[in-house]
Amino acid sequence: MELLPHEKQVVEYEKTIAEFKEKNKENSLLSSSEIQKLDKRLDRLKEKIYSDLTPWERVQICRHPSRPRTVNYIEGMCEEFVELCGDRTFRDDPAVVGGFAKIQGQRFMLIGQEKGCDTKSRMHRNFGMLCPEGFRKALRLAKMAEKFGLPIIFLVDTPGAFPGLTAEERGQGWAIATNLFELARLATPIIVIVIGEGCSGGALGMAIGDVVAMLEHSYYSVISPEGCASILWKDPKKNSDAAAMLKMHGEDLKGFAIVDAVIKEPIGGAHHNPAATYRSVQEYVLQEWLKLKDLPVEELLEKRYQKFRTIGLYETSSESDSEA
């Protein structure tokens, strides 16, 4: 597994403890209580390091090559999954994976953005950057879910919509705008979870829902830290400053009422214990579905509308308040 800079100290300590334990089998250098003390010290070290991460270090965790992706969540959470392909207009976009899913006996339409796991699959998936047909495919499946009365799960993980000329020629902006318009009035529960990167319109085009949650080390932002640094300071090396200023992680966004919940990850990030992460996401999905499933459609849509309508609302005191 690829090591991030802040993980090196932990890995070195783990190696040292493993060597002690191996030698201890032959020579009994340490008692069992002393070994337990070493393990506890390791746990404390992990807690100290991972509770004091900078925003940029959390971005690095979010981008870790071994971080679980949409296809991994499908394998880890679903008892059944039937993939559906194509936008019925141009072609299938491999950057979107979607289909009928069964989780704990309940049927959903699960639609996620997929980056790929190695060079070949990343090229095939276009690194998770959706073309217009990807957004149209997602909307087609969402409308199918509405038709069959299925709740929808959106898994967001993209560095942004594909900015290429061909995508623009095929109506990239139009496709994203259409998704925002249509998903806002779709008459079925929608649960959105940002599992990795959630960048710009590429994320927003699949992030309109009744509840929006984020994994602890995922991020959701109008732009990547590197992009922000290039624009503001003309220096992409200021990415750590940009990551801090963008307030792109769950605790900040929850405070701004942009997301509703932050799902805890295992210590070190989702890639350290994918199975535990799948369980946490599955529990959250089922818990939220139980809250949404019996709401009248009119109430569901009104709450969804108001949720997004009030994002970014800025209020000033009235003249009477200031005089008082």
From Swiss-Prot:
PROSITE patterns: COA_CT_CTER
GO biological process terms, semicolon-separated: fatty acid biosynthetic process; malonyl-CoA biosynthetic process
Catalyzed reactions per annotation: N(6)-carboxybiotinyl-L-lysyl-[protein] + acetyl-CoA = N(6)-biotinyl-L-lysyl-[protein] + malonyl-CoA
Residues forming coiled coils: none
Pathway entry: Lipid metabolism; malonyl-CoA biosynthesis; malonyl-CoA from acetyl-CoA: step 1/1
EC code: 2.1.3.15
The family this protein is said to belong to: Belongs to the AccA family.
Subunit structure: Acetyl-CoA carboxylase is a heterohexamer composed of biotin carboxyl carrier protein (AccB), biotin carboxylase (AccC) and two subunits each of ACCase subunit alpha (AccA) and ACCase subunit beta (AccD).
Designated name of the protein: Acetyl-coenzyme A carboxylase carboxyl transferase subunit alpha
Organism in which the protein naturally occurs: Chlamydia trachomatis serovar D (strain ATCC VR-885 / DSM 19411 / UW-3/Cx)
Lineage, opening ranks: Bacteria, Pseudomonadati, Chlamydiota, Chlamydiia, Chlamydiales
Gene behind the chain: accA
